[in-house]
From Swiss-Prot:
Residues annotated for ATP binding in this entry: A34, M35, S36, G37, G38, V39, D40, S41, M60, G151
Keyword Disulfide bond applies: yes
GO cellular component, one term: cytoplasm
Organism: Anaplasma marginale (strain St. Maries)
Main enzyme class: transferase
Catalytic activity line of the entry: S-sulfanyl-L-cysteinyl-[protein] + uridine(34) in tRNA + AH2 + ATP = 2-thiouridine(34) in tRNA + L-cysteinyl-[protein] + A + AMP + diphosphate + H(+)
GO biological process annotation, one example: tRNA wobble position uridine thiolation
Protein name per UniProt: tRNA-specific 2-thiouridylase MnmA
Length: 387
């Protein structure tokens, strides 16, 4: 079928499919599209194919459908089928990349171990760091890809001769938080065609392109955690990690008993099953003692945090006086002004200008307004030094 953009598709010029490789026309450019089986990546593949690019679809098989992973999850059999169906209908090749073993080792096992350490992990970032932007990019090069395109809602621009990431234009769909660990070398190979579009417009494009997945709901869960039931996944995959322990107040009083620290996250208020004259929150998870520490909201808020494995886009040396940044501590949270100083070897200290909830295992992602600077993993310095 011949693709002719309608006025609705142009969206006042925001649909920008300029040559993905400078100086190389579409018909000579091979684009490997990371297809999850969802609407966004399917639209990317369809638009590039109809624009004349040599498109190859690639879908990662990350897990089998099982009680632990769930049948309704991303990168499972249903999603692979949907991606193959889109590729077959449009007429471009599609490959399935079996990363089940490495995904279990580097993402699921890390997820389990993170909870055992009393952290709150972000497996989607770990997946980006490993199977998606390490292994998949390697496979894309091996099959002759010039670039890899994804359905992420971020913008890729060149600033002062360096490739940079800007937040997606749609603030409700911006995914820059999850890409803080992308390296400068990987970014040279990546393309994000949807960064200037709103999700509603992408849905409209899918309908106008008659894609079979046009009405497919967005995935809301961690791909191997169906219906956000991560506790069930932990019980199935590592039963020994779920054991009873004490709930204590920050002042040392014993308040009750818990059925596993993996059932709690820092900042949690509901589900503590203890009575008190004022609201109590999870302030800290002491994995060494298998103890949940709770207290008033004032004990929860912090002005400083510590990060490790810092990644910068592009590579950057923090001035000795520190660097003023906008810091985001949650994927859906607002940014706060902060200053980061280097502690050497990829470690840093971030001082916030506002009180915030700080959860070890989450990411502290750094921005200069719209521009993604990089980020690192929040860690408990006392536990780290005592390890």
């Amino acid at each position: 079928m011949q693709f002719i953009p309608s006025p609705a598709m142009v969206f006042d010029g925001s649909l920008n499919l300029d040559p993905l490789v400078s100086g190389k026309p579409p018909e000579e450019t091979t684009v490997v599209v990371a297809m999850s089986g969802g609407v966004d990546s399917s639209v990317v593949a369809a638009l590039l194919h109809e624009r004349g690019y040599k498109v190859i679809g690639a879908t990662m098989q990350l897990h089998s459908s099982s009680p632990a992973s769930g049948a309704k999850s991303c990168c499972g059999s249903v999603d692979i089928y949907d991606a193959k169906r889109v590729a077959s209908t449009l007429g471009f090749p599609h490959y399935v990349l079996d990363y089940e073993e490495v995904f279990r080792r580097e993402v699921i096992d890390d997820f389990i171990n993170s909870y055992k350490r009393g952290e709150t992990p972000i497996p989607c970032v770990k997946c980006n760091q490993t199977v998606k932007f390490r292994d998949m990019l390697k496979a894309a090069r091996a099959i002759g890809g010039d670039v890899v395109a994804t359905g992420h809602y971020v913008r890729r621009v060149e600033i002062a001769g360096e490739q940079q990431i800007l937040r997606g234009k749609d603030p409700q769909k911006d995914q820059s938080y999850f890409l803080f660990s992308v390296t400068s070398e990987q970014l040279k190979f990546l393309r994000f065609p949807l960064g200037d579009l709103a999700k509603s417009n992408v849905r409209l494009l899918a309908q106008q392109l008659n894609l079979e997945v046009a009405d497919k709901p967005d995935s809301q869960d961690i791909c191997f955690v169906p219906e956000n039931s991560y506790r069930e996944v932990l019980r199935n995959l590592d039963p020994a990690s779920v054991k009873k322990g004490k709930i204590v107040h920050v002042d040392g009083r014993l308040l009750g008993e818990h059925d596993g620290i993996s059932n709690f996250t820092v900042g949690q208020r509901r589900g503590l099953n203890i009575s008190a004259p004022y609201p109590l929150y999870v302030v800290r998870l002491d994995a060494a003692q298998n103890t949940v520490v709770v207290g008033p909201q004032s004990a929860l808020m912090k002005r400083a945090l510590f990060v490790k494995n810092l990644n910068w886009l592009p590579d950057y040396n923090i001035p000795k006086r520190g660097l003023a940044v906008d810091a985001r501590l949650r994927s859906s949270g607002a940014t706060v002004r902060a200053t980061i100083t280097s502690d050497g070897d990829g470690y840093g200290t971030v001082v916030l200008e506002e009180d915030c909830v700080v959860s070890p295992g989450q990411a502290c992602v750094l921005y200069d307004k719209e521009r993604l600077l990089g980020g690192g993993w929040i860690y408990n310095k006392l536990c780290h030094e005592g390890a």
